[in-house]
């Protein structure tokens, strides 16, 4: 027969494992979001820079 302590140990390990997976997944989502933010920021800066260059050419 399986003792209560054994069941508690297995439950604790399962819970700990699921928390580790959630932490890793959360970190992954955070990194992906930060990467997208930086990429979007770079695109906006390039668009603004090209717009400024185009307006300078028109003014001349």
UniProtKB/Swiss-Prot annotation:
Provide the membrane topology annotation: Single-pass membrane protein
Q: What does this protein do?
A: Plays a role in the assembly or stability of the cytochrome c oxidase complex (COX).
Compartments in which it is found = Mitochondrion membrane
- InterPro entries the UniProt entry points to: COX14
- Chief subcellular location: mitochondrion
Q: Which GO terms describe its cellular component?
A: mitochondrial membrane
Taxonomically, the superkingdom here is Eukaryota
Keywords of the record: Membrane, Mitochondrion, Transmembrane, Transmembrane helix
- Which organism is the protein's source? Danio rerio (Zebrafish)
Q: What is this protein called?
A: Cytochrome c oxidase assembly protein COX14 homolog
* Ranges that cross the membrane: 10-32
């Amino acid at each position: 027969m399986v003792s209560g302590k054994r069941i508690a140990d297995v439950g604790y390990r399962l819970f700990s494992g699921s928390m580790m997976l959630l932490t890793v997944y959360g970190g992954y989502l955070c990194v992906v979001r930060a990467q997208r933010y930086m990429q979007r920021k770079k695109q906006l800066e390039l668009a603004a820079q090209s717009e400024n260059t185009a307006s300078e050419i028109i003014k001349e």
